[in-house]
Structure formats: C-alpha cells, structure tokens
Amino acid sequence: GSSLIEIGEVLKDFPLFTLDIVSFDLLIGTRLREKDYIKEIKGYDNRLLIHASRVYRSSSMKIPGKPVAPPYIGDWDTGICIKLLSKRPLEAVAANTGAYFSISKECFQGNQPAIRKSVVKRWRLEIRAEDEERYMRGELVEPIQPIIFYIDRNTPEKYIDCIIEAVRDWRPAFEKAGFKNAIDARLAPTVEEDPDFSIYDSTYPFISWKISGQNNAYGPTPCEPRSGEIIACHIGIFCSVLNLEQKWYFAQCGANDPQAWNIELPDSLQYEQIKQVLTHEVGHTLGLEHNFLGSSHFSIDQLRDNDFLSQYSIGSSIMDYVRCNYALRPQDKVDLRNRRVRVGEYDKWAIEWGYRIFPGKDASEREKNRSLWNQEKQKDPSLHFSGRMDVRAVSYTHLRAHETKANL
C-alpha cells in the first residue's frame, strides 16, 4: 500500500521557504500568514519545485537618513527547489591554500575525538572513463557535465553577448586544468522552447538582471555539506552597478581617456565594464575567494606597456578589487581592454589547483600529488594569495605595503 502525507501547511510556513528571515533587510514587514498559498508544484525524478505566493505588510519605520515610507501590502512570488543529493559525493579537496571558499565539518571515527576538516567549494567536473587516458596524457577533454549559465531574458539585449563573453573568459583557466568547453552561457529558454525551465530550479545556474538602485553584483556558492560540491548558482547583477563603474572609470582613467568625462559612456566601454563585473562574480561562483595580492606584482612601466598588458592584464587576478588601470598617463596608448582587470595567471592557477584531476590510485594519493604540484607552482610569487578576510578590517600597522585593497 501507500501513504499520503499532508505537507501543505509545512511548505507554506517553514521559515526557510518564506522571506521571513530576510524581511528586515528587504524592508517588507510582516507576513500575512492567512494569505499564503501554493500556486504550483512540479515533481521530477530528483527534485520538487514549489511556486508559492506570500503577502507582506510593511509598517512605517523611521530609518536614519531616509524618509518615512508609508505602509503598504506587497505580493511576493517565491520559488523553492528541494533536490536529492547525489548518491556518490564529489571527491573532496582539502582547503589548505585559502584561495577557495570552504566549508568545515566534524569528522568522527570510532571512539576517537572529532577532527575538524575544511574542504573547498567547487563544481563537479568529471571525465568519461574512455577519456581518462587522453586526459592524463595532457589532452583537453570535455567534462561529462559542463557548467552552463542561463541568462535572464530581462537583461538588456545589448549586454547579452558581453555577458556570454564574460563567462567564456574562464575557459582558458579550465583548459589549464585539462577541460575543453567546461563553461558557457546562453539566453534562458522561453516557455515554448523548454516548458520545464524555471529560474528557481537549482539545476540551472542563472544570471539575473535586477532593476535596482543598488550599485553592486553578487555571486554566491551554495554547496552540499558532504564534499563542498557547488549545487546551485544564482548570480545577481544590479543594473545600477554601471553607475559605480562609471565613477571608477572617471576617477581612475579620466586622465588618459576623454571618454570618461561623458555623462553617458559609449557602449563599447560599458561592455568592458559589464564583463569586468560579471567575470569577477563568476569567479566567486566557481569557488574563488578574493585575492588582494593580485594587483601587487607589476611595475608602473609594465602597467603602461600595451603589449605587456595584452598578455598579462593589469594584475594577476580578477578576484582582487582592483578595477581600472590608473597608472596610465595622458600620452599612453593602450587598448580599451587593457584599462581594466581580466582573468590573470593566478586565476588560471587557482582553477587548475581546484579542478584538475590528479593521478593516483585513491583520493589520498591524488591529494598528495596535488600538493606536490602546488609546491612547485608556489615558487612563482604572482601565484601567491592573501585574503586577509577583508583588508579593510586589518590595521595598517599589520599590512605589508603590497597588500592593499582596490589598489595597484
């Protein structure tokens, strides 16, 4: 026989399935529970998608520096994806370099004290058995499941191509790790093209274009706790981030490029700025932490040399907070792409360290070979890492001169 379990009320009221835990940040007020209802439920072999409606009533609240907003009632659509984890966890990689976001766990064995271990967050990139010999010989092979980002159809059409290019800018890094066509982006399908596609289905990594006055973007790394495998991704780009990019470009490149003086920047320049923002956020979603040493390796003369910049960019890592090449002087002639930071040698090393499948008969031997490979690589100072959590919080007396944030 079979049993029918009523979970409707649980789905409607479970805190993680509502906006209650972020209601203060969103300033949406209190949820009107009596108005909660489930619009749709879709079931698949390995996941359940729930489309629920919530209603929140805000109250007049005085926030310093902001006018008092009148109370209002707002309708919110929420999407929930409950997904089975893989029966076979991804082989974990010990977090011993600082380069990656990590997750810690307590490991128990027999009656021994628990050992705390940290593993990096990364995507599952695996190869087919028939490709293993070619891969170990150094040939590029395609992963079983590449990382494919889907682009919000609300994104302005003129930015779609540069968003795709920004994602593909990580391909050379994955090629260093032995993978061909490991990462890509495409426009999200319409309902007619794929009725099963949903932006709240964690099966589909998504790049969301948000209409907001927020001058920012974000790239989270939700992962499963057994192995650190990244199992979902929802990058957010706030449209107003271009306002911030314009200010940076004016302040940092205005002496070299008269275009920076315009109130509205030309499309060619905006495309480069979008690519800079998104490539950085994609780096986060691949597992990479900020590296504030990325902008410390090149001399002023190198930063003014177009040929050098074409090969190495303005820093070793796009995961630094350096934005524009303000070492340029009015007479310097450099390509537009050489006025901003791009994927650098550190980023390529980091992807190879985290994603390459190293030889070995078991996980322990593969981890040993990864460590030996990295020991040799670390002889190159441009591959060094300094996260410092956030260097803004570190006293200047504890900072070496080259460990500065948002600086060349």
Language-model-derived ranges and their functions:
Residues G1-T155, A173, A188-E245, Y249-D267, ...:
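Auxiliary tRNA-acceptor-end handling modules of aminoacyl-tRNA synthetases
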Residues P156-A182:
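Zn2+-dependent metallopeptidase catalytic core
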Residues Y159, I163-A166, Q270, I274, ...:
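Stable alpha-helical elements in mature extracytoplasmic
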Residues I160-I163, A173, G219-T221, H234-I235, ...:
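Short, solvent-exposed loop/turn and secondary-structure capping segments
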Residues L187-K210, E272-L328:
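The catalytic-center signature of Zn2+-dependent metalloproteases
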Residues F238-S268, V277, L336-S364:
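Polar, glycine-rich mid-to-C-terminal structural blocks
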Residues S295-H297, D301-R400:
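Conserved catalytic/binding loops enriched for acidic/polar residues
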Residues H398-A401, K405-L408:
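Single conserved hydrophobic/aromatic residue that forms the stacking wall/gate
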